[in-house]
Amino acid sequence: SHSTTNKKEWKKNLLKQVLRPFSKVYATNYMCCSELAGRWLFGDKAYDSGQVYLLNNAIDLDKFKYNESLRKKKRKELGISDDTLVIGHIGRFVAQKNHTFLIDIFNEVHKKNNNSILLLAGQGPLKEEIENKIKELKLNDSVRFLGQRSDVNELYQAFDVFCLPSLYEGLPVVGVEAQASGILCILSNTMTKETKVLDITKFMSLNNTPEEWADSILDDVKRYKRIDTSKEMTSKNFNIKEEAKKLEKYYLNLYNNGGEEK
């Protein structure tokens, strides 16, 4: 199970609700990538009784771990000085990602620290709308559109803060990647609490004003010293090399026991 529901997408929700019971008709074993998804698809009773195997959305930590020399190289490549505050976002330009609110947050950040920049990676149907908003706020020189990228793991190195004020999420992999890169993460509290793997992550309400989000970002970044978080991420079961071994063991166990978990 990767699925959850969102009240804003009623058509998708209806389809999911119709199909959900069929997920268990022929399944002999249940698996999920988060508690939220597991409970939604298989039910609280199945989850609480241990019938659902939880396997985290693990990543290749070696690709994402903090690297100071790569950070400097990437910033130089992007034409960003070492002392510039960089706020980053990775996601499609769709309503869910709440880019309009993100721009309002950055506008408040920039008022208080004009040596700041916002990097936006991704494509999507609302890109032009966001570009127009940036022009209206006269932030053209301080917001950059990076397009669809194949070097996302390196982009995280250039960030100081990862901001994700989504209207809704399940457990976003970008949140896991950002924490693996050792950067501060400011996320909306609309997503599952499991997204907070490390203490460098903070949830904020979308009811807070953009200025309150900005103040939180500026206060937190002053106090934070970036470190390599790969060991801690491994201990939290987000190292894909270790999780792959667990999955292999899980499958072998099923095979050796006729499909039953032992």
Where are these regions (language model features)?
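Membrane-interface segments of envelope glycosyltransferases acting on lipid-linked substrates or membrane lipids
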Residues: 1-262
